[in-house]
Amino acid sequence: MCIVNRMSVFHTHRPHVLTRQHTWWEGRRRFTRTEHETPVGTLSSFVEDGGFTTWRHELLLKSPEDYAAIRYFLKDERYEPDYAEFDRAQRAGADDSICRSSFGLEPLQELISGNVMSMEHFCEEWMERRDEVLSLYEILVENRRKIYSIVAESPAGHVNYGGNVTPEIIGPKVFEKYYLPHYHEAAEVMHRHGKLIGCHFDANNRIIADAIARTPLDYIEAFTPAPDTDMTLAEARAAWPDKVLWIN
């Protein structure tokens, strides 16, 4: 048992998007509004500092007219290796901590629990404008592929790929079609470099347990046993005998 220091090993920037941020206080509450100006429209978000978390009052997608600007915003992302701080922290905490990095969320999960839209909004858009949602998904797929080698070549020995997957929202068919291929792609790159890859599966995983078993993931991070979820530790060990369970 030790401290887990979660750190990125790459830097993200958008060279053709102008970002402005305004932060203010109302009593003891701290708010931030961020605007992203693209050639095809301006996007904004509105969040509140919650101390150990962030309360998200507004995300980027507010109407169907925002899809074009969001596509531009996502396509403009550039990634550069940023290994120095991770390497420094790993050396400094060698005796009592480990450093773990991340690829970010899975492409579809980025649209469910990321910064584009809320989970409720995603469910509505998935039913009403699925083609638009999938246009964002395809951009995110290509973006993640640009990150795989950067992370695999970093000092990080083990890396999470996404998580907070909610099977009640997506169901097993969507999970198999839109999640599994990306675990396979990322794992192939990581394993080629002798690195480990896992995912933050902390929810009711029973209906996707067989699919998880078919992934090349090395560990299941934040597995939460029953009664808090619908799988016991014994059931998880039986379902995933070749994977390390990192208990939540």
Label for each model-derived stretch:
Residues 1-55, 84-88, 94-98, 105, ...:
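N-terminal basic, low-complexity leaders that serve as flexible interaction/assembly modules and, when applicable
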Residues 37, 68-248:
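Active-site loop segments of alpha/beta catalytic cores
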Residues 49-51, 61-64, 216-217:
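Short, charged/polar low-complexity linear motifs in solvent-exposed/disordered segments
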Residues 54-73:
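A short, surface-exposed interaction/processing loop segment used at functional sites
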